[in-house]
Amino acid sequence: MANTTSAKKATRKIARRTAVNKARRSRVRGFIRKVEEAIATGDLAVATEALKAAQPEIQRAATRGVLHGNTASRKVSRLAQRVKALSA
């Protein structure tokens, strides 16, 4: 339990930031899920559009510190690789 005023304030701030970060992470997961569903159905056009929508969301999450930059790049790269494989 926080004793000092500054520690209590820090606890409140952490709770707010955690809520925001959870929402952002959930949003990114939703975009990734849409790409994966499109890949599973084998629809190249839908998968490409979903990837175009997901990529900036994933990068934005990395910029905001929700995901590590390398993790975001890896996710985008692997999704793009799978979408590209549909066209082959």
Curated annotation (Swiss-Prot):
Q: Where is this region: Disordered?
A: 1-21
Q: Which is an annotated GO molecular function term of this record? A: structural constituent of ribosome
Pfam family membership, one: Ribosomal_S20p
NCBIfam families associated with the record = S20
- Stated role: Binds directly to 16S ribosomal RNA.
Write out the similarity annotation: Belongs to the bacterial ribosomal protein bS20 family.
Write down what this protein is called. Small ribosomal subunit protein bS20
Task: State the species of origin.
Answer: Agrobacterium fabrum (strain C58 / ATCC 33970)
**Designated gene of the protein:** rpsT
